[in-house]
Amino acid sequence: MVEAAPPGPGPLRRTFLVPEIKSLDQYDFSRAKAAASLAWVLRAAFGGAEHVPPELWEPFYTDQYAQEHVKPPVTRLLLSAELYCRAWRQALPQLETPPNPSALLALLARRGTVPALPERPVREADLRHQPILMGAHLAVIDALMAAFAFEWTKTLPGPLALTSLEHKLLFWVDTTVRRLQEKTEQEAAQRASPAAPADGAAPAQPSIRYRKDRVVARRAPCFPTVTSLQDLASGAALAATIHCYCPQLLRLEEVCLKDPMSVADSLYNLQLVQDFCASRLPRGCPLSLEDLLYVPPPLKVNLVVMLAELFMCFEVLKPDFVQVKDLPDGHAASPRGTEASPPQNNSGSSSPVFTFRHPLLSSGGPQSPLRGSTGSLKSSPSMSHMEALGKAWNRQLSRPLSQAVSFSTPFGLDSDVDVVMGDPVLLRSVSSDSLGPPRPAPARTPTQPPPEPGDLPTIEEALQIIHSAEPRLLPDGAADGSFYLHSPEGPSKPSLASPYLPEGTSKPLSDRPTKAPVYMPHPETPSKPSPCLVGEASKPPAPSEGSPKAVASSPAATNSEVKMTSFAERKKQLVKAEAEAGAGSPTSTPAPPEALSSEMSELSARLEEKRRAIEAQKRRIEAIFAKHRQRLGKSAFLQVQPREASGEAEAEAEEADSGPVPGGERPAGEGQGEPTSRPKAVTFSPDLGPVPHEGLGEYNRAVSKLSAALSSLQRDMQRLTDQQQRLLAPPEAPGSAPPPAAWVIPGPTTGPKAASPSPARRVPATRRSPGPGPSQSPRSPKHTRPAELRLAPLTRVLTPPHDVDSLPHLRKFSPSQVPVQTRSSILLAEETPPEEPAARPGLIEIPLGSLADPAAEDEGDGSPAGAEDSLEEEASSEGEPRVGLGFFYKDEDKPEDEMAQKRASLLERQQRRAEEARRRKQWQEVEKEQRREEAARLAQEEAPGPAPLVSAVPMATPAPAARAPAEEEVGPRKGDFTRQEYERRAQLKLMDDLDKVLRPRAAGSGGPGRGGRRATRPRSGCCDDSALARSPARGLLGSRLSKIYSQSTLSLSTVANEAHNNLGVKRPTSRAPSPSGLMSPSRLPGSRERDWENGSNASSPASVPEYTGPRLYKEPSAKSNKFIIHNALSHCCLAGKVNEPQKNRILEEIEKSKANHFLILFRDSSCQFRALYTLSGETEELSRLAGYGPRTVTPAMVEGIYKYNSDRKRFTQIPAKTMSMSVDAFTIQGHLWQGKKPTTPKKGGGTPK
């Protein structure tokens, strides 16, 4: 694996093979913790890794079942507790050695490291318990490691605020790396200084300077900043520390110090560290490469003790191979506790490093990443692969052009979505092309003064912001994607809403304050403006902003009344009063309709999935783009340099001169009055300007298209948010009761013009005409997310529903009849013309559902109440052609009084529905009484025979006649759906009577065997309900009509309307009080059946509207395994074309049979099909239905029983002998098979003849 080299001054040559490691999903944290801890304690007890017996090198063994166990010798050592005492004696010989486990536990308790289980401290009995309690032993080992680390690092200096040993060790490593960085930069500057006079007096010619130090810049190392144990995962910090103390053993050129560290690079560095520890440290390196790479939280103590051993080796023991490198400011291991200097020359030097401000330090003044830290470092709770490798690696943001690499932005470009969705780390491709105005040439010299520290947050701080609920601090100068509400700085220093720029433009940033603004999700006062867009709060909007052209596709509305967070966060908000928002809306806020909000949430979740998929694809393309840029040399960037400077200047001039971007992607005046210098905040522009390679143009176009698609999806989600806000907002009309209000986060008002009308008043408002209120935007209110991604304008509009009255009916449609469409047609166009307000040529909508009957769209215009309440409303009342299934604004010209009439009609319809539900409930009770009386009368008349056929069929007519008034009263208002329901009930009544009439005939003429047996089984008529309800789709009349003869309760009407019954109709007001009050057609009083026995959801779907309330105890009724047998025959017993005729014959027999339980007869345990039997529930005899076998099988003949597993398509033998409803197959005793025994003697007897 490693080819060692002599430690001479010559170059070290090491050959490494990339080792095979376990992926993160296969890496077992608990197993890794046990292995590392046992290896450490064994090495500590035996005085070094070389003294451990070979049989104990691997503490685990694998048994024949592939299960890992601790080896018995290790177990014996742990149970005797001798191992711990020997480890104490070897590691701390100057201290008193505890003689027994109790003394050891007392000693650890005195030192403050009490080993504890999750619920209590470890006792001596736990250490001697058999079988071994590994958790107790691991707790003792952790306490030993902590005690040893404290003892070894007594001389470790550090800031007084750092009370944790982990913090002090990380501070030591970070300080050592910082000093090494300064030393390296000084050496690079000295090497570059002799070449400076060759440039002449032309500092404005950066190309010559780049040529001179091209070799140096190409090999410039990027030193990491260490703020947590996660930063050690790349191995760069540890390897650099080893180089500082042992430069002759590990040269700096041997260490991989790159900015985007791949897994192979990290493994290379970690192998260097592992080899050094194994060869130089007394206890070696008990951690595996996976442990060092993934840095799991359970191994935190193990990593800390490894750092402590390194410190003891380098600073306390100081063996011969430790030859400390001469670093600036004295000794490397003597960091100044309170005056640690910040890294120098970290902007444009040959070894660029950007130091992120540590999350636990105060924000004032330059400081070291760990100075003044209080509290504990928070390690990331997420262990995803990317985050485990480089969660807190720091990225350099202002590099030379020759070093354009990927960097990690702690907040994504759309940070409000990323924070909610839990994806705070997105690898973005950064390029210095067209990121800002051209900078002067000295900005790239190695002696550039450092920028102000504390510009961007660390990943840990981003996670802290995500996982903390109280008001949080946003890091100074956070990336533009990081959005926050209501900065304490006021409107003077607003933040950009989006880091995306329109193509061909460059957007300067305002200077960020050093004090971090406070992130307040729920502002208390609406007086402070929200820094939504540059120039929004401090400057009045341009006149062109009021035109639809400027606002039609703008993702962020200027002067919006309420600033909303992301769509995902919005679902978690409570219903808030809107009084303090200054909008004049009513104060009563009833709860929003749950069904409507759930549908909207489901649709938004699908849109979110699409957005994340496009974002992931965009990140992949950006990664490819970054790698491609890294492969380019200095000469390619030199060609780009002059064009970039001119292009950026033109872009800046264009931005200053132009008004709003076409399509309203950027408000007018956004760049006015802004400084031309760009600070350290980063933006990402899809258009990267001229590039030296054709491939870069393709990458740019792909990234731009994906970014455009992503922004359009997010605009769709925002329009969904606005639509839901309008639909659920309370009305303002006087004299009308307010409907359920929307979820509102009270926000600021930016001026007198900012108070837009209430969302409820804007329900039918349009994109094209301004509303009745003094709003600047024709589409108000726009509760946009400040971090909306903005790109080239796309003609993409999600138009809300035409009429709010159609929305309560959405819950009455089924996915089968009206599919909820979530198509999101994405226009990936590079140059899209601005959207014309009148023509709307490229209108793309995301339909929320279908609009219904063409007869009901003119609500509020004098249409009758019946037409208003129809379930099927048309998309357009103005005669415009209907496009797809989208909702469009068509009623934009209706005045306010018509809107008030609409609201009043909506309330009236709701009252009418409640009254109608009460009437329907009363009518159902009357109908049940009539059915009970008719059933009793028919039961008495059935005794003579089939004579009641003449009198029973006409009896079906009184019930429809009696229902006629109710039908006339309710039908016109309910529309087609209600009429179908009443017709279905009439059919149900007819079929019930026909079923009862034909039952005696079926019992008398159904065959000698089955008919007689059925006559003695009064309960058999109720057994098919649930089974037939689960039956696969067949012909509407043919196969189901035969079920009348099998006394099925599933009537013809429910079969013919089965598709309509699956509509998911929800009528909570028409629910029956209890399922026991419903009378199934086949439940006759003379059949001695109990109502609660046979409650089946398939008996009458029209009259049993999905009761979900409390139920009485229900005895389990006999269910059918017909379809399990069907599945077994089709996929297991008689699968394939060869057996298809036999399978079809048997399936026909199953369909003809009236039995509920079928069993397959196997020849023997090899499960060879022989016959199909039916089980009699009373006699427990099996009767052959088809196949070969005994005609009747008694329980004494059964040898084995089997159950079929539909998922695994196989039979499993049950260790029982009793037949039950869960048995699907059986075998009989071998001597009962008489088929082949007579044939063998015949052959033998025929040979003498």
From Swiss-Prot:
Compartments reported by the entry: Cytoplasm, Cytoskeleton; Cell junction, Adherens junction; Cytoplasm; Cytoplasm, Cytoskeleton, Cilium axoneme
Keywords, alphabetical: Cell junction, Cell projection, Cilium biogenesis/degradation, Coiled coil, Cytoplasm, Cytoskeleton, Microtubule, Phosphoprotein
Domain remark in the UniProt entry: The CKK domain binds microtubules and specifically recognizes the minus-end of microtubules.
Presence of keyword Cytoplasm: yes
Protein name per the record: Calmodulin-regulated spectrin-associated protein 3
Principal location: cytoplasm
Bias (Low complexity): 189-205, 341-352, 594-604, 754-779, 950-964
GO biological process, one term: in utero embryonic development
Family to which the UniProt record says this protein belongs: Belongs to the CAMSAP1 family.
Domain CKK: 1109-1243
